[in-house]
Swiss-Prot record:
UniProt membrane topology term: Multi-pass membrane protein
Function: Catalyzes the initial step of the lipid cycle reactions in the biosynthesis of the cell wall peptidoglycan: transfers peptidoglycan precursor phospho-MurNAc-pentapeptide from UDP-MurNAc-pentapeptide onto the lipid carrier undecaprenyl phosphate, yielding undecaprenyl-pyrophosphoryl-MurNAc-pentapeptide, known as lipid I.
Gene of this entry: mraY
Transmembrane stretches, start-end: 3-23, 51-71, 79-99, 115-135, 138-158, 169-189, 195-215, 221-243, 306-326
Protein's name in the database: Phospho-N-acetylmuramoyl-pentapeptide-transferase
Amino acid sequence: MFISISAGIVTFLLTLVGIPAFIQFYRKAQITGQQMHEDVKQHQAKAGTPTMGGLVFLIASVLVAFFFALFSNQLSNNVGMILFILVLYGLIGFLDDFLKVFRKINEGLNPKQKLALQLLGGVIFYLFYERGGDILSVFGYPVHLGFFYIFFALFWLVGFSNAVNLTDGVDGLASISVVISLSAYGVIAYVQGQMDILLVILAMIGGLLGFFIFNHKPAKVFMGDVGSLALGGMLAAISMALHQEWTLLIIGIVYVFETTSVMMQVSYFKLTGGKRIFRMTPVHHHFELGGLSGKGNPWSEWKVDFFFWGVGLLASLLTLAILYLM
């Protein structure tokens, strides 16, 4: 436990030092910053804010977790595969950000390219991680999927990777939401005695807390796709490594809600010839524009943050209660 906590502290400090250096480099190199949604007027002041800051906490957490695990004899298959997903999905996000920022390709990777790379990473993860007989845990009950587990694994990794990416649209929202989710999985890992996975979790929590100091409103830096895609993939990988896949539907309710809002909006728009359910999606923008109803007073980014963090915290506590108190 001491090793895991130490890893978190070291990653926190490295990120705390690394982010200002990253911002300074970004400014000196005169790199074009984040582009903003035109429909959310309060976001226009953020135009030009440095992005790709997730690169800092990602590198710090991966290196710290790897070396701490190596020197404490905890470099297990599970640790290796979680770090692999972090690195690969981080690289996919980096390429996406690179095309947007440096090549001025607004779309970045097109959806087919991004999906292909995410699926490739998922296949490699499936082939090497300890699956325990391709058993899917559904509310604590084992479901033997056999070879078909690979389709679930791909859906889980790609789905939650993109879901966290959608959540990263308000200052600090994604970073602390993931901290809350990881904290819940940290408890599960500790109870299961999987201290190797706990080490990786605490290393990332440390990095995200260090990043949040510069990412809360008004944000001095954004994590970019390099951070959000990696974090979503990490959450999916951890839920599978702990054989508690179903828990991510509740622990990750914020990401599920954000993704579902987009799917509902697009489907309803097509079916009705242009009508909308929400003022704007992902749904955090709906709250920004007009509160819960979409027709009331606009919510500040802090209010949106605390609402979603509260939902995420309650969902995480509910999951732990279901697992250990019922």
